[in-house]
């Protein structure tokens, strides 16, 4: 097997939790877009070009009204501001990857960040191709789920309420897997404590960015001490 196929093999197994989560959540998004009156091309193209779940749900409503570019820009920036901190924390891991880093930056979703930041590169696997395949597979799962959701939407008659819980379950599984593999739980415990405190102080709608800033500072200081 060539290095690309080896990397794809390992990346596929690593990304299986994302396939399950994005499959169901993508279906939900596609069904939502169908209910708004859009055909499958809209969720498919938005999934390919925007690839930011929360922003895509918002854009569905925006496309129905008068388009305000500045409002759309500020809304998407506010919803996805946490990605700034994802990028900062991945600078070292993406160093020296050449052209691959451009797609890695574009495809940095919450779930992909959770995988690539915690995942150890399998022995004998090319780092660049491994990270690239994970990122590509994750986006592919989302695009397929969103497209299928719109296509099968007219044929679904059962209640889909609560389907978005799969995202919470997926993050829990990723956290548990990382916990079992790591020798030092300081980073995981600090993340839980800091997020919990920020949730209490800033409320559920405003705690994510504050949590990311504090966690980034804490981990940077911890790394310098080491």
Question: Where in the sequence are the language-model features?
Answer:
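Alpha-helical transmembrane segments and their membrane-interface exit regions
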Residues: 51-55, 78-85, 170-176, 195-196, ...
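Membrane-embedded alpha-helical modules
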Residues: 128-210, 217
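Juxtamembrane membrane-interface segments at transmembrane alpha-helix termini
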Residues: 55-61, 85-90, 176-181, 199-208, ...
């Amino acid at each position: 097997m060539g290095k690309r196929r080896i990397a794809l093999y390992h990346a596929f197994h690593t990304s299986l939790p994302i396939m399950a989560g994005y499959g169901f959540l993508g279906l939900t998004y596609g069904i939502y877009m169908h209910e708004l009156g859009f055909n499958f091309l809209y969720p498919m193209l938005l999934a390919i070009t925007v690839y930011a779940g929360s922003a895509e749900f918002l854009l569905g409503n925006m496309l129905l009204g008068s388009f305000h570019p500045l409002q759309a820009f500020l809304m998407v920036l506010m919803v996805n501001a946490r990605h700034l901190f994802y990028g900062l924390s991945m600078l070292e891991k993406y160093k020296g990857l050449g052209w691959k880093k451009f797609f890695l930056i574009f495809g940095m979703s919450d779930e992909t960040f959770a995988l690539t930041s915690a995942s150890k590169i399998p022995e004998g696997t090319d780092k660049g191709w491994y990270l690239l395949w994970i990122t590509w597979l994750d986006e592919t799962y989302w695009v397929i789920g969103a497209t299928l959701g719109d296509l099968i939407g007219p044929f679904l008659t059962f209640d889909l309420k609560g389907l978005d819980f799969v995202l919470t379950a997926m993050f829990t599984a990723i956290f548990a897997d990382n916990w079992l593999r790591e020798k030092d739980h300081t980073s995981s415990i600090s993340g839980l404590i800091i997020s919990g405190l920020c949730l209490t102080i800033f409320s559920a709608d405003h705690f994510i960015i504050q949590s990311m800033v504090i966690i980034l500072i804490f981990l940077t200081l911890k790394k310098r001490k080491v």
